[in-house]
C-alpha cells in the first residue's frame, strides 16, 4: 500500500487535477494534514538521527519544564511521581509511543499539538493550528537539541553550502 502510486502522490494541487477532480474523489492528490503530537516529535528526532527505535521496554521521560510536576503534587509525597527526572542518553530519544504520562500533567508539548486527554476516551483527535504550536517548535528543548545535532551533522559531512541546503530541504 505504501509503495502504491496513489499513496505517494503530492498534496500540491495542479490546475489540471483541480479541474478533473475538484473534490479529490479519484484521489488525484494526497491529502493535506498536520501530523499528530507523537508523530511530530518522532519526525523531529528521526530527521536529526536521534530517534531510538528500540521496541518495548520502559517508558521514556522526555524534557519538561522544571518544577512543573512539583506544582501538581499539592505538597505530598507521591513516590516516583513526586519529582520528574527526564531520561538521559538513548532512553531520552525513544519513540513518543513510549512517553510516560501523568494524568494530571501530560507532556505540555504533546498537549499543544492536540494529544488526547487520558481522562476520557477520544474517538477522533482534534486537529488545530495555533500560534502556540509555532512557538513550541521554536523553543522546545528537544526540538532545539535535534536542530543542533542536525546542523552539526550537516556541517561535519558536507562542505559546500548549496549542497548542504539541498540535503536539508
Protein language model annotation of sequence segments:
Residues 8, 13-168:
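An acidic, gly/pro-interrupted, aromatic-rich
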Amino acid at each position: 500500500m505504501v509503495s502504491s502510486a496513489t499513496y505517494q502522490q503530492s498534496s500540491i494541487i495542479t490546475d489540471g487535477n483541480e479541474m478533473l477532480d475538484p473534490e479529490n474523489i479519484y484521489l488525484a492528490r494526497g491529502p493535506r494534514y498536520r501530523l499528530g503530537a507523537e508523530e511530530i516529535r518522532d519526525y523531529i528526532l528521526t530527521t536529526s538521527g536521534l530517534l531510538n527505535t528500540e521496541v518495548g521496554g520502559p517508558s521514556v521521560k522526555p524534557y519538561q519544564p522544571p518544577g512543573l510536576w512539583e506544582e501538581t503534587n499539592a505538597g505530598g509525597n507521591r513516590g516516583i511521581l513526586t519529582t520528574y527526572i527526564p531520561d538521559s542518553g538513548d532512553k531520552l530519544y525513544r519513540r513518543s509511543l513510549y512517553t510516560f504520562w501523568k494524568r494530571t500533567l501530560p507532556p505540555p508539548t504533546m498537549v499543544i499539538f492536540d494529544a488526547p486527554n487520558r481522562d476520557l476516551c477520544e474517538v477522533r483527535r482534534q486537529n488545530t493550528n495555533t500560534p502556540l504550536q509555532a512557538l513550541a517548535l521554536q523553543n522546545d528543548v528537544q526540538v532545539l537539541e535535534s536542530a543542533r545535532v542536525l546542523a552539526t551533522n550537516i556541517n561535519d559531512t558536507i562542505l559546500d553550502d548549496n549542497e548542504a541546503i539541498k540535503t536539508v530541504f
